[in-house]
Regions:
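Subset-of-secretome marker
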Residues: 1-197
Length: 197
């Protein structure tokens, strides 16, 4: 019942287009050593410098399309979350609003599954790292490193939102998404290596 209520409220954001401000904070931590881990750390430093890891807030005006700014990115809907993907859900009423907290079950997403993110449980409600995004980022490093595989495990994903009890309009939403990735790559100089990020 809580999940169904959340889905309706989340989907109303893209239908009613109330205006939204998206603030994103992205970080990753590289575990491992050697040349490949060193390259991964250099990529992270470059992403920090060009603003990819801490992009400027995005403000979408009332009435404008929210499809690109609000999860799920570039879809006309926001959530198709199923109860089977959830480990717990709670709802507390306070001051005319419902505060909903959803904790998702852990999910392993292979590099091949990341090619079809909407077929994953996380991809039904949050933006996950997609294979085409990884491929695009790796193009600039193709002279240095070849990516063979990238497995992601999403663990601890939490959604906390406040929904107006009368209008069922979402007032705020906070998505916390944690992905642990294992990257298998090779570099001409050092050979094969595995890095956890």
């Amino acid at each position: 019942e809580i999940i169904a209520y959340f889905n309706v409220a989340a989907n109303k954001v893209k239908i009613e287009k109330p205006g939204v401000k998206k603030i994103e904070e992205i970080s990753f931590h590289v575990k491992g050593d050697g040349a490949i881990a060193n390259i991964a750390n250099k990529v992270q430093d470059a992403l920090k410098k060009n603003g990819t890891l801490n992009p400027d807030p995005i403000t979408v005006k009332k009435g404008a399309s929210h499809n690109a700014a609000f999860p799920v990115e570039n879809q006309s809907w926001s959530s198709r979350l199923s109860a089977g993907a959830v480990s717990s859900a709670s709802c507390v009423e306070k001051n005319g609003a419902y505060m909903i907290t959803i904790r998702m079950k852990d999910e392993h997403i292979s590099y091949e599954q990341a090619r079809k993110p909407l077929q994953t449980k996380h991809g039904q409600v949050v933006d996950i790292l997609k294979a085409n995004e990884i491929d695009e980022q790796m193009k600039s490093l193709s002279w240095l490193v070849t990516l063979h595989d990238l497995d992601q495990t999403y663990s601890g994903t939490t959604i906390v939102c406040t929904i107006d009890a009368k209008s069922q309009t979402m007032r705020s939403a906070h998505y916390r998404i944690i992905s642990n990735a294992t990257i298998k790559a090779s570099a001409p100089i050092v050979g094969d290596a595995t890095v956890n990020a």
